[in-house]
Amino acid sequence: RCLHAGAACSGPIQKIPCCGTCSRRKCT
């Protein structure tokens, strides 16, 4: 399970990581 592009993120360490990377508080 991971967050898709456009989802809000707080950084590399979070409960559900981004599928890609976290940039400007948004998953890319």
From Swiss-Prot:
Expression by tissue, per the entry, reads: Expressed by the venom gland.
Which positions form S-S bridges? C2-C19, C9-C22, C18-C27
Any one GO MF annotation of this record: toxin activity
**Alphabetic keyword roster:** Disulfide bond, G-protein coupled receptor impairing toxin, Knottin, Secreted, Toxin
The entry's cellular-component GO terms read:
extracellular region
SUPFAM superfamilies documented for this protein: omega toxin-like
Q: Where in the cell is it found?
A: Secreted
| Further information | Negative results: does not show activity when tested at 100 uM on mammalian sodium channels (Nav1.1, Nav1.2, Nav1.3, Nav1.4, Nav1.5, Nav1.6, Nav1.7, and Nav1.8), potassium channels (Kv1.1, Kv1.2, Kv1.3, Kv1.4, Kv1.5, Kv1.6, Kv2.1, Kv3.1, Kv4.3, Kv7.1, Kv7.3, Kv10.1, Kv11.1(hERG), GIRK1), a calcium channel (Cav3.3), and nicotinic acetylcholine receceptors alpha1-beta-1-gamma-delta and nAChR alpha-7.
Q: What does this protein do?
A: Toxin that acts as an agonist on melanocortin receptors (MC1R, MC3R, MC5R, MC5R). After binding to MC1R, the peptide activates the hMC1R/Gs pathway, but after binding to MC4R, it is not able to activate or antagonize the MC4R/Gs pathway. Inhibits melanocyte stimulating hormone (MSH)-binding to human receptors (Ki=1.8 uM to MC1R, Ki=19.8 uM to MC3R, Ki=7.1 uM to MC4R, Ki=10.0 uM to MC5R). This toxin is structurally unrelated to the natural agonists.
Free-text comment about domains = The presence of a 'disulfide through disulfide knot' structurally defines this protein as a knottin.
What name does this protein carry? NU-theraphotoxin-Preg1a
